[in-house]
Structures are given as structure tokens and as C-alpha cells.
A protein has these predicted regions:
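A short, highly charged nucleic-acid-interacting micro-segment common to nuclease
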Residues: 196-210
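Hydrophobic/aromatic-rich core segments of domains that either
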Residues: 209-276
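Bacterial N-terminal signal peptides that target proteins for export
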Residues: 1-11
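Secondary-structure boundary elements
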Residues: 133-199
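C-terminal motif of bacterial Sec signal peptides marking the signal peptidase cleavage site
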Residues: 17-20
């Protein structure tokens, strides 16, 4: 009996010791991810509008765009806007903003300039797809956007974000040379296949599609930007992007870089007027782009006008490394 009591006491003491120690070996505390490794904090928000776009169309029209988007997401077909400044061509300006804020809207509705009634402050549209198809489009757009943003990291600055999202859009893309002839008798199909949604999700479109698609991605990643139009004798009417990267403004042409590359990334206005298509001017909703921003910075001159085959973001070294055939490479500081 004495031995049993002694054994029981020893077991009880051992149990108390294990409880005090947690009963498990000590574990190393988890090391938090560094900004270079942690995912980019992102939430899809269709209300986001680039500052330059808001500067051009005004805060009242941006508020109108947000009201239209909310109604669209709710399956409605009209909104009545509050009193505000809707001068000029508000129908066109509203459509322009919507394409870079909510690409699905232009893809699955028949909205055009005439759907904005200034007299009644009413915006109307009809759906060109069934409710189920509209939901499929929204789901695909969200999935694609999240996939693009997953390439970014918490510590990525504006240069890294701009480069990575540019590649995400262009790498798998192809220009749709058949769109005009294929959908001449089907306006709904034409709108769908030339929308910024098509460029993002289907990796196909025309210049308008890719410029506004890049504007959407950059706006979601909080990069200021706006799509601009230009015309030249050699290239014809064309749309591309102007964007601010680390406080400087540049031209970017994702359409001419479809298939991957940075040949037309980070151009100056002089580049655009010479080797990059001879576009001697560009306009943002009728406003001369050269009057809106200084487009003379040559930071990306070592990158553009060259066929690079790959680009790697070295976050530890703070640089982007561009490589080409025969081990040719150039290094671009990210800051």
C-alpha cells in the first residue's frame, strides 16, 4: 500500500510539472513575413477612380459613376442623379470613367452617350446578357483581378506594381484583328469583345480595350493614370495610357506590347512623337495631355525601345532586372 501511495504521489507531481510547462516542448515563435514576402493587401473596389480622371470629369460625375455601378451590381437599369455639374458631354465622360472603374458594365450593357439625359439627370441602360451571364462576368472579373494583384507584395512601390501589372495584362494577350468584320451586325457582341473586360479576362481586344484594362488595374493598385487618344499618319487613331510612377508621368502602350514585353513602357512624349508611332499629340477627353503633366522624364529609356524576353523583380536588391537573348540585361532601380 505504501508503495502504491508513493507511486501515485510521484505521478501526480509529474502531471503538475507537465501542466506547468504546457506538456509540450517550447516552440519557436513564428517569424512575421517581411514586406518583400507578405501578400499585397488588396480588396476589389469598383468605386475607385484615378485622381487624374476625377480632375478631368469632376467630382459630381465620379459620384454619378459610383451610383451607376451600385445600381448595375444590384441588377437595376436606371439611376436618377442628384443636382450637380454635368456640363460638356457628360454621357461620354461618364462612360469613359466607368470603363476604368468597372469593366463589366461596358461589357454587358448597351450604355452609350445618349443614355445620359441631362434634362432629367437620368442614366439608363439595358443588359445584353442574362442575369446569370452577368454574374459569371462579374465573378470572372473578380477572379482575374485578384490573380493579377496576387503578383504584388506588401512592400512593392509604384515602379514594381506598374511593371508587374503591365506584364500581367500583356503577357498572354493578343490583338483581335477580326473584331470589326466579325461583329459588324451584332453590336452587343462587338461591345463585349472590345471592352476592357475582354482584355482582362479573355486576353483579347483592341487598343481601347487594353488601355482601359491597364487603367483599371493601375487604379485598383492606387496608381494615378488615365487613357489618352492620339492620331498619326503612320499608325492612325490609337489609345494608350499615361500614368504616374514615383511622382513622374509616362506613356505606356499595352496594346503594342501584347504577347509580353516593355518596348513601349515608360515612354516620354518625345518618344511617342518619334520612334513610338509618330503621335505628335495626345488628348484626355479633349484636353491636351502635355498640358496636364510633364511627360519628359527618361527614367525608363534603358528599358523601352528594346525587346526584353523577361523581367524579374529583385525585392531584396531593390531593382528590376530585364534580360534578353545572349545574356543581355539591364538593371532598373525600383526607387
Amino acid at each position: 500500500m505504501y508503495r502504491k501511495k508513493k507511486l501515485l504521489a510521484l505521478l501526480l507531481a509529474l502531471a503538475m510539472l507537465l501542466c506547468a510547462c504546457g506538456g509540450q516542448p517550447a516552440q519557436e515563435p513564428e517569424t512575421p513575413e517581411t514586406p518583400e514576402e507578405a501578400p499585397y493587401a488588396f480588396t476589389l473596389e469598383y468605386h475607385r477612380c484615378a485622381p487624374l480622371v476625377e480632375q478631368q470629369i469632376g467630382s459630381d460625375l465620379v459620384a454619378a459613376a459610383r451610383q451607376v455601378i451600385d445600381a448595375f451590381l444590384a441588377g437595376e437599369t436606371a439611376v436618377m442623379l442628384p443636382e450637380g455639374d454635368y456640363g460638356g458631354n457628360p454621357g461620354n465622360d461618364l462612360g469613359y470613367a466607368l470603363n476604368s472603374m468597372c469593366p463589366a458594365f461596358g461589357a454587358v450593357t448597351d450604355y452609350d452617350d445618349n443614355r445620359f439625359d441631362k434634362a432629367t439627370r437620368t442614366v439608363t441602360w439595358a443588359y445584353t446578357r442574362t442575369p446569370e451571364q452577368v454574374q459569371e462576368v462579374l465573378t470572372a472579373l473578380e477572379r482575374t483581378t485578384v490573380d493579377c494583384m496576387s503578383l504584388l507584395r506588401q512592400g512593392d512601390g509604384e515602379t514594381a506594381r506598374a511593371l508587374l501589372l503591365y506584364r500581367a495584362l500583356t503577357e498572354q494577350a493578343a490583338y483581335d484583328y477580326d473584331v470589326s468584320g466579325t461583329y459588324d451586325d451584332d453590336p452587343a457582341a462587338y461591345r463585349f469583345h472590345t471592352s476592357s473586360y475582354s482584355a482582362l479576362v479573355l486576353h483579347s481586344g483592341i487598343c481601347y480595350s487594353f488601355a482601359q484594362a491597364l487603367a483599371f488595374l493601375y487604379t485598383q493598385a492606387e496608381l494615378d493614370c488615365a487613357a489618352v487618344m492620339g492620331d498619326s499618319e503612320t499608325a492612325g487613331l490609337h489609345m494608350w495610357l499615361m500614368a504616374a510612377i514615383n511622382g513622374k508621368w509616362y506613356y505606356l502602350d499595352p496594346t503594342w506590347d501584347v504577347g509580353g514585353g516593355w518596348y513601349y513602357f515608360g515612354m516620354t512624349a518625345e518618344d511617342r512623337a518619334t520612334w513610338a508611332g509618330e503621335f505628335t499629340g495626345a488628348a484626355l477627353l479633349g484636353q491636351d495631355a502635355a498640358q496636364l503633366a510633364d511627360l519628359s522624364d527618361t527614367r525608363f529609356s534603358a528599358v523601352n525601345c528594346h525587346w526584353w524576353t523577361d523581367m524579374t523583380i529583385d525585392r531584396q536588391a531593390g531593382q528590376a532586372v530585364f534580360t534578353a537573348a545572349e545574356d543581355e540585361k539591364t538593371v532598373l532601380p525600383l526607387n
